[in-house]
Amino acid sequence: MAKKLVAVVKLAIQAGKATPAPPIGPALGQHGVNIMAFCKEYNAKTADQAGMVVPVEISIYEDRSFTFVLKTPPASVLIKKALGIESGSSEPHKVKVGSLTRAQLRQIAEQKLPDLNARDVEAAMKIIAGTARSMGVTIVD
């Protein structure tokens, strides 16, 4: 018989830097999960993505066991990394902080495609372009 799912916890954690401190400890502790086991597994699976924020969806079962699925980093983080900037614009439609080329946009869209609500890369590019615009980033051809 399949294990009964008790909860699904979604967290955004720095890759390779999961610790039992908040926000991870309280989120998993209230469900009785072995926090150190999760931290070790997460850090091992995300060691190659150091410096990125990697969202994770943790499924917690009745017997206090868990499984987790790693998602792709948020589009805003990928855009900031591509441009080499610290943060987006505080006034996105007035102050521009940089510009992305179509090739960079396509690369980010292809990376995010599995997690986006899009059927093809063109639709994913439109979603990423919208995120970029809201950060004060222009798209150039």
From Swiss-Prot:
The keyword Nuclease does not apply. Pfam families: Ribosomal_L11, Ribosomal_L11_N. One of its GO terms (cellular component) is cytosolic large ribosomal subunit. One of its GO terms (biological process) is translation. InterPro entries: Ribosomal_uL11, Ribosomal_uL11_bac-typ, Ribosomal_uL11_C, Ribosomal_uL11_C_sf, Ribosomal_uL11_CS, Ribosomal_uL11_N, Ribosomal_uL11_N_sf. The keyword RNA-binding applies. Keywords: Methylation, Ribonucleoprotein, Ribosomal protein, RNA-binding, rRNA-binding. PROSITE patterns: RIBOSOMAL_L11. PANTHER family: 60S RIBOSOMAL PROTEIN L12 (PTHR11661), LARGE RIBOSOMAL SUBUNIT PROTEIN UL11M (PTHR11661:SF1). NCBIfam families: L11_bact (TIGR01632). Forms part of the ribosomal stalk which helps the ribosome interact with GTP-bound translation factors. Belongs to the universal ribosomal protein uL11 family. Part of the ribosomal stalk of the 50S ribosomal subunit. Interacts with L10 and the large rRNA to form the base of the stalk. L10 forms an elongated spine to which L12 dimers bind in a sequential fashion forming a multimeric L10(L12)X complex. This is Large ribosomal subunit protein uL11. The gene is rplK.
